[in-house]
Design a protein with these regions (language model features):
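Bacterial extracytoplasmic/cell-wall-associated proteins, especially those involved in peptidoglycan
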Residues: 57-59, 73-220
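Signal peptide-directed extracytoplasmic domains
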Residues: 1-124
Length: 220
């Protein structure tokens, strides 16, 4: 009778293995679990990231959404973001990079996957940048949200001008837009489709920066 704990996942096994060898190979201490290298492109939303991880056999979309929504990841910059229960709370915090992940596994494996990407974000946002943001009156969440607006509102050619527009509208409530950012990309994120001018006044969402002043609830 096997006493080792079997870890769920995808394994590379040899057909010549006997029973004990098979169990040993699938124990939590085993190095035989199959891995896959995945590149998360810049600009991917959480939905796109989860779909990619599912496609590559790392975890299912459902498991990733559940973990993202309900697991309390212990990073200070996640305090005060969207509440537990909404997987979009990790939007903007899953750092785009190339990772090596184990294939398969349940909730605990999904926690490790997401924690790895959040940790990579943490490593790319040093204390000096956090202090600079605080001195400007912004939280890490604010800065990540602003950066996502800049990235999604442009094709990469005029990010400086878009950044200037956003900060002017945030810092000067008497600016011509009186606190409304009027960022189309945020409304596209909210609706998940191509928008029309009619949507500016009809889509009731905090991501509609034509109807709601200031920053949307989080990155897009």
């Amino acid at each position: 009778k096997a006493e080792q704990k079997i870890t769920s996942g995808t394994y590379e096994l040899n057909t010549d293995m006997d029973y004990n060898a098979l169990v040993n190979s699938m124990s939590s201490r085993s190095g035989s679990r199959m891995t896959v290298s995945i590149t998360i492109p810049e600009g991917y939303t959480v939905d796109q990231i989860f779909a990619l991880l599912d496609e590559k056999g790392v975890s299912t979309v459902e498991t990733l959404q559940n973990v993202a929504a309900n697991h309390d990841f212990k990073f200070s910059f996640l305090k005060g973001v969207l509440p537990l229960g909404d997987y979009h709370r990790l939007e903007g915090y899953l750092f785009p990079d190339t990772y090596e992940f184990y294939m398969g596994g349940g909730e605990s494996a999904a926690i490790q996957v997401l924690n790895k990407m959040i940790l990579r974000f943490d490593q790319q946002f040093p204390d000096a940048l956090r202090e600079q943001a605080a001195n400007m009156g912004y939280s890490v969440h604010d800065i990540v949200t602003i950066a996502s607006l800049i990235e999604k509102e442009t094709d990469g050619s005029d990010q400086t001008s878009i950044a200037s527009v956003i900060y002017n509208r945030l810092n000067n409530p008497n600016y011509e837009t009186v606190g409304y950012l009027q960022i189309d990309a945020a409304l596209v994120y909210a609706t998940g489709r191509v928008i029309t001018q009619a949507d500016y006044q009809t889509v009731d969402s905090p991501y509609n920066t034509y109807l709601y002043k200031g920053l949307p609830p989080g990155p897009i």
